[in-house]
Amino acid sequence: MAVLWGDAETGPHGAMTRFVPRFDAGIHTHANDARIVVIKGAYLYKDDAGEKRVGPGDFISIPGGTKHWSGGDENEGALFYNEMAGKFDLIPVM
């Protein structure tokens, strides 16, 4: 994760993030809202409403507290801009 503005350890921020091919973040939540814009590859997302394949130029908004899974496309992974309303966290859900 390369932070472009703000401070990911203490508050709101925007960062470029890369998921390698087949990356699996597991089922988790974030305390704060997240907004993601995919630059390259595909960001894979799944929540109780279903699955999404978010491609270049596409946008997804994930409300804080939403239980979800995310990962990278099997061939290219994903390069995306991630903006969070507060500090970065990833809270695993068992």
Give the location of each predicted region.
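A short glycine-rich, His/Asp/Glu-containing loop-to-beta-strand
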Residues: 1-26
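Conserved hydrophobic/aromatic beta-strand scaffold that supports enzyme active sites
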Residues: 3, 14-18, 35, 51, ...
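Short acidic-glycine-tyrosine-enriched beta hairpin
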Residues: 7-9, 43, 47-67
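Extracytoplasmic
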Residues: 10-14, 31-33, 75
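Glycine- and acidic-residue-biased ligand/ion/polar-headgroup-sensing regions
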Residues: 20-23, 30-49
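Short beta-strand His + acidic residue motifs that chelate non-heme Fe in jelly-roll/DSBH
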Residues: 25-27, 45-46, 67-74
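Ligand-binding loop in jelly-roll beta-barrel domains
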Residues: 64-89
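Short, charged, solvent-exposed linker or helix-capping segments at domain edges/interfaces
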Residues: 91-94
